[in-house]
């Protein structure tokens, strides 16, 4: 048992030389000194509180007497009552000080635990980036009407302008993934947002200069948005643990859906009150504000962030790669893996149906359901809202299943099967429905179940190759964009020679092919390191 005694107390054995006055606390039983002044006090205060060396001051009076006798026997002090009182006072001081120290440490821990998780701040910034992404993408679909009237564009020219975005968007998917994986997602996503925001703001000037300038500006906008998605995937692979992966990705992608809703809602108001250029100026300026926050608050990985707590960093790095950007892309290894091709094929099958519905839906509402343009525009918003809600609901389900012990592979297959078979089922019902209200409901349900794909194939890039998540998304999304381009064009051809039922049948067949390929070849395990 350890007892603390200040040697400044006169407690020498008769005949012995006087003890030197010192502030060092010693073990009267012959132990070494452990510190001078307040440093020693702090050491023993901590020991006292933990109960490893000093008993609690709530001990009985008999125990205190026994300790007093032990110390006297060891030559600690004589029968002087003042010395005993002093010792008791010192011990009480040590224990009370230790309690205060621990209380302060506890408050610090509570403050740290109460801090908003940095990883979710990164997720929210990505969410807001993709909100702006689709706001800037859909504004042209509204502004093109007054622009066509002002500049005298025919339908063929309008189609050329609308497609010019995809020139840049398609070409930068893989390039953006390589760039993000080798440099870091922060730089690439920041570049993408500021680049497409500047291109958006310059659109009115380009339109007035002439058609070639407008086409180049829209292609430049596609370049910015093309690198954004692979960069986001790279960032989340570093920041989000697997137990939260589905929810985080669902939230970010729901930003795209809500961005479409916001853009479609505010563009007509701005055009009506301030003219069509105001849409591009206002939406483009928002990206500049976002970039200033991103540049000062975001980091490519938690290892680079000096402000993240040690507890959160440990949580993240225990479930993610969290490492430095890669130096080389192992293309041979990546392209030799069947799960990678399952991603590519499934992404193509998924986007064929999705792009057709979102691109041709206003026409379907107008020609088949006989809605006027105002009603068509209103009902076009409904699927986007449904997708935003369903994506987050599906993400919560997926993460819950993983946390309860279901394998990631099983969860990804379940969620993507819903994302394929749900739309396939509801599209087959459209040919049997006469009520416009039921047709709109079927469309909404089709897109709502489609959004479960965010917890399926869209989460799988980070599962199978977290270090190359940007490249993997670039590969699969290139196939997805091609599906959108070819599917949109093929739909026009099918409608010219067939019917809407034929359009939906092609989509259903591809959904079934995607389901088969996904369940046979996909995995949730890491296969590329």
UniProtKB/Swiss-Prot annotation:
It is a multi-pass membrane protein. Keywords: Chloroplast, Ion transport, Membrane, Plastid, Transit peptide, Transmembrane, Transmembrane helix, Transport. Residues 13-39, 52-78 are annotated as: Disordered. Residues 28-39 have a biased composition (Gly residues). It is found in: Plastid, Chloroplast membrane. The chain crosses the membrane at residues 120-140, 158-178, 187-207, 209-229, 251-271, 274-294, 340-360, 378-398, 418-438, 469-489, 503-523. Residues 1-55 form a transit peptide. InterPro entries: MFS (IPR011701), MFS_dom (IPR020846), MFS_Na/Anion_cotransporter (IPR050382), MFS_trans_sf (IPR036259), SLC17A9-like (IPR044777). Residues 67-76 have a biased composition (Basic and acidic residues). SUPFAM superfamilies: MFS general substrate transporter. One of its GO terms (cellular component) is chloroplast membrane. GO terms for biological process: monoatomic ion transport. GO terms for molecular function: phosphate transmembrane transporter activity. Its main location: plastid. CDD domains: MFS_SLC17A9_like. It comes from the Eukaryota. Belongs to the major facilitator superfamily. Sodium/anion cotransporter (TC 2.A.1.14) family. Probable anion transporter. This is Probable anion transporter 1, chloroplastic. It comes from Oryza sativa subsp. japonica. The gene is PHT4;1.
């Amino acid at each position: 048992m350890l007892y603390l005694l200040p040697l400044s107390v006169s407690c020498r054995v008769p005949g012995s030389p006087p003890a030197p006055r010192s502030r060092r606390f010693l073990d009267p039983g012959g132990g070494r000194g452990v510190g001078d002044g307040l440093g020693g006090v702090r050491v023993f205060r901590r020991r006292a509180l933990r109960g490893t060396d000093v008993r609690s001051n709530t001990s009985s009076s008999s125990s205190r007497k026994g300790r007093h006798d032990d110390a006297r026997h060891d030559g600690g002090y004589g029968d002087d009552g003042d010395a005993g009182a002093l010792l008791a006072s010192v011990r009480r001081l040590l224990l009370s000080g230790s309690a205060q120290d621990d209380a302060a440490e506890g408050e610090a821990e509570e403050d740290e635990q109460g801090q908003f998780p940095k990883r979710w701040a990164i997720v929210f910034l990505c969410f807001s980036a993709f909100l702006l992404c689709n706001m800037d993408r859909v504004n042209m679909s509204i502004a093109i009407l007054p622009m066509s009237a002002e500049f005298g564009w025919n339908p063929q020219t309008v189609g050329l302008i609308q497609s010019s975005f995809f020139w840049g968007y398609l070409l930068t998917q893989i390039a953006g993934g390589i760039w993000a994986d080798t440099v870091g997602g922060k730089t690439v996503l920041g570049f993408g947002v500021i680049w497409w925001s500047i291109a958006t703001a310059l659109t009115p000037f380009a339109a007035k200069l002439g058609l070639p300038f407008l086409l180049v500006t829209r292609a430049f906008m596609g370049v910015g948005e093309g690198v954004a998605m692979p960069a986001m995937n790279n960032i989340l692979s570093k920041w989000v643990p697997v137990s939260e992966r589905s929810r985080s990705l669902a939230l970010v992608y729901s930003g795209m859906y809500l961005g479409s809703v916001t853009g479609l809602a505010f563009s007509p108001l701005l055009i009506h009150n301030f003219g069509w250029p105001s849409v591009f100026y206002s939406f483009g300026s928002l990206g500049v504000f976002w970039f200033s926050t991103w540049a000062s608050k975001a980091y490519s990985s938690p290892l680079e962030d000096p402000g993240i707590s040690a507890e959160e960093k440990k949580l993240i790095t225990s479930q993610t790669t969290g490492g430095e950007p890669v130096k080389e892309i192992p293309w041979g290894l990546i392209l030799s893996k069947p799960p990678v091709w399952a991603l590519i094929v499934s992404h193509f099958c998924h986007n064929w149906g999705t792009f057709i519905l979102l691109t041709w839906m206003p026409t379907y509402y107008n020609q088949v359901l006989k809605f006027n343009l105002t009603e068509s525009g209103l009902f076009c918003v409904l699927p986007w809202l449904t997708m935003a809600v369903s994506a987050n609901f599906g993400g919560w389900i997926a993460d819950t299943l993983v946390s309860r012990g279901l394998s990631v592979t099983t969860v990804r297959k379940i969620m993507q099967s819903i994302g394929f078979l749900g739309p396939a089922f509801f599209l087959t019902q459209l040919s049997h429905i006469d009520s416009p209200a039921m047709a709109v409901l079927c469309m909404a349900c089709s897109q709502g179940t489609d959004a479960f794909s965010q917890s399926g194939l869209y989460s799988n890039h980070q599962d199978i190759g977290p270090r190359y998540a940007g490249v993997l998304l670039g590969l699969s999304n290139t196939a997805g964009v091609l599906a959108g381009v070819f599917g949109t064009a093929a739909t026009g051809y099918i409608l010219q020679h067939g019917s809407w039922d034929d359009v939906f049948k092609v989509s259903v067949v591809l959904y079934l092919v995607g389901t088969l390929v996904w369940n046979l070849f996909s995995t949730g395990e890491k296969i590329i390191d």
